[in-house]
Amino acid sequence: LINSGQLMFEKPIVTFNAAQVTEKNEARYITDIFNENAYLLHSEIIPYSEWCSLISVNDTDEKHFLIRKGAVPCGYLKINGLEDGNDGWISILAVASAFQRKGIGKYAVSYAESFFKKQGKLCVKIHTTTDNYPARKLYEKCGYLLCNSTNTYTAKDKLTYFKQI
């Protein structure tokens, strides 16, 4: 549009999408995203070859998703608990540092909730640790409640959040 001789542009719409990871070539993105966040997840660095193996196992109780902003890979989501019970679990959620605090985590949690709801689950649960403040803030913002904690009085104290869906 032209307004007083100035071009006006529409604000770009942010588009996130999640795609189930089935091919090893997507494991490169997961390797980079996960390893960048390994310290917050209290995990060791996982090499690309191991991610290739994990993805190709085809475990029916879990699914791996690559989250993209447009076409750019920016997050990794792993869910499990698909086979038994009423609870689904978000077992890993990692967002590339360049994309943190831009809505990717919120999108991934919402995507997992929708996925579980379609599977007939009644509740979503998530483990994190007391020192992972970004994750705790995200889960609480998304309506999750703290239901359990194991206190060893270290940074690795585990917290369990849940939400009825």
Predicted regions: what is each one?
Residues 116-128:
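Conserved GNAT acetyl-CoA-binding A-motif
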Residues 1-11, 152-165:
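Terminal substrate-recognition subdomain of acyl/acetyltransferases
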Residues 140-148:
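Conserved acetyl-CoA-binding loop of GNAT-fold acetyltransferases
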Residues 126-136, 152-157:
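Conserved beta-strand-loop-alpha-helix junction that forms the acyl-donor binding cleft
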Residues 85-87, 123, 156-158:
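A generic structural signal for beta-strand entry/edge sites
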Residues 11-92, 96-98, 109-111, 115, ...:
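Acetyl-CoA-dependent GNAT
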Residues 72, 92, 96-110, 119, ...:
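Conserved glycine-rich acetyl-CoA-binding loop
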